[in-house]
């Protein structure tokens, strides 16, 4: 497993965690590999926070399958830093990928 800065970051500090063994899906990784992915993800998060002290939160994502937006056929976990004010209303987070599903809270 290893972490690296994304070549096309959507935000400063955007990083990836990637297994060395080829698997397309998180569900193809062994339980040991899944545990190691989380350990490396935690270490990468620490490095990202050292480099960008103004981070207010993170989105952590895996696009698993073409319908989910996977364009690289190799498992990678995306660590996307979020900054105060970077989106007018972040409520709903990744639910925004499906139109009309982000606002699930009732007044």
Residue map of PLM features:
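HIT superfamily nucleotide-processing domains
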Residues: 1-107
């Amino acid at each position: 497993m290893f972490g690296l800065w994304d070549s096309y970051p959507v935000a400063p500090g955007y990083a990836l965690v990637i297994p060395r063994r080829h698997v397309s899906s998180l569900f193809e990784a062994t339980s040991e590999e899944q545990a190691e992915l989380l350990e490396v993800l935690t270490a990468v998060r620490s490095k990202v926070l050292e480099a960008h002290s103004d981070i207010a939160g993170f989105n952590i994502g895996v696009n698993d399958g073409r319908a989910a937006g996977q364009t690289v056929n190799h498992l990678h976990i995306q660590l996307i830093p979020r900054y105060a004010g970077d989106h007018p209303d972040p409520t709903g987070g990744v639910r925004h990928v499906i139109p009309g599903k982000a606002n699930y809270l009732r007044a």
